Amino acid sequence: MNHIELINLIKNNCKTAAQEKYIGRLEKKFSIRSKRTLGTLEDLYSSLLVNKQHQLLIETLPYFLTIKFEGNYNHWYCIEHILEDIYFAILAMGGNEVLENQIFCHYKTVYDFINKDGSSNRYAIDLEWNNSHQAINKFNDEIRSCEEDKDVLYETSVRASLSREVVSIILLCKIKSLEFDDSLLELANEQLEILTNAKYKRYI
């Protein structure tokens, strides 16, 4: 699957005005190395997940499996977020060991690289923080702050990010052979359900 096939697949299955807007941006200019493209893809994939387009998300996995980590985590984390959305969709569809392992192997390749040499320690620290229960608590604090400030755009982003954080924790638990707390999945599903509210329609 190339990027044109990816765009056409999603375009033919758009459900919302926001999705059509994101696809329009990608049709105008698409570069998987561009922060603008990656940001639009992240927004689009959040929308697909909130709208329960799980099968569509899964069908796009082959494209993202072709993208290899090249040592720049500042670029890679956006791809990681998209893979986390797809992983969450797989779980929502009842799970698929083969597909879950494909994403896990991609994730572990990056984890192993980050932790293999001292020069990447700052990324290792970031990864440990971003995949912790403390991070979930931090996100909840941010949501409260967004509600107080009435910042709907940022609130949408924070709520959508919770599902990605939960998948990160699942994958990190697999790497470290730790037990995963299933209540975190319930928390993520609650946030995705909240995002179906009309308040967030402009972005979802």
Roles of regions detected by a PLM:
Residues 1-41:
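N-terminal alpha-helical interaction modules that lie
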Residues 4-7, 35-46, 76-92, 116-140, ...:
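Amphipathic alpha-helical repeat scaffolds of TPR domains
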Residues 21-27, 57-64, 96-111, 138-142, ...:
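Alpha-helical repeat scaffolds
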Residues 27-35, 63-74, 108-116:
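Solenoid-like repeat scaffolds
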Residues 36, 56, 74, 78-81, ...:
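Structural signature of alpha-solenoid helical repeat junctions
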Residues 69-77, 111-124, 152, 195-202:
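Boundary/linker segments of alpha-helical solenoid repeat arrays
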Residues 154-190, 197:
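Extended alpha-helical scaffolding segments
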